[in-house]
Amino acid sequence: MPSFDVSVVTQVKKILEQEAGYLRLRTSEGDIGILPNHAPFVAELSMGKMEIESPNKDRRDIYFLSGGFLEISDNQATVIADEVFPIEKIDVESEQALVENLKKELEKVSTEEEKRKLQKKIKISLAKIDAKNN
């Protein structure tokens, strides 16, 4: 089976390195699917799911990414992620409660910087909920 290497890292550590037959993730331009021998490519990643399918299609690992960058060259896909973790670790009820608390907190803040930080946290939590449910 044709395959390529997928490496996922954050600023802190290497998260995974594995062989894949297919990789799907969300870029700032929309969802993209990567197959073996893909042309060289660089993209900004948006919040959403990242799916890695094994070369023989017997396993599919799904992760949540909060953004980052993708580079493809020489049959190697490198994902540099802001935040990444397995989708099964998302607790929808906890994220929904967090969103409600953050919205209440948002009503009380006075500076634009505080508002932007809270809005980003809300956006990430909503993206986690969407990724888990879809």
Curated annotation (Swiss-Prot):
GO molecular function, one term: ATP binding
Chief location of this protein within or outside the cell: membrane
Compartments where located: Cell inner membrane
Record keyword Nuclease present: no
A GO cellular component entry from the record: proton-transporting ATP synthase complex
Record's keyword terms, sorted: ATP synthesis, Cell inner membrane, Cell membrane, CF(1), Hydrogen ion transport, Ion transport, Membrane, Transport
PANTHER family the UniProt entry points to: ATP SYNTHASE DELTA/EPSILON CHAIN (PTHR13822), ATP SYNTHASE EPSILON CHAIN, CHLOROPLASTIC (PTHR13822:SF10)
Quaternary structure and interacting proteins, as annotated: F-type ATPases have 2 components, CF(1) - the catalytic core - and CF(0) - the membrane proton channel. CF(1) has five subunits: alpha(3), beta(3), gamma(1), delta(1), epsilon(1). CF(0) has three main subunits: a, b and c.
The protein's name: ATP synthase epsilon chain
Organism: Fusobacterium nucleatum subsp. nucleatum (strain ATCC 25586 / DSM 15643 / BCRC 10681 / CIP 101130 / JCM 8532 / KCTC 2640 / LMG 13131 / VPI 4355)
Phylogenetic lineage: Bacteria, Fusobacteriati, Fusobacteriota, Fusobacteriia, Fusobacteriales
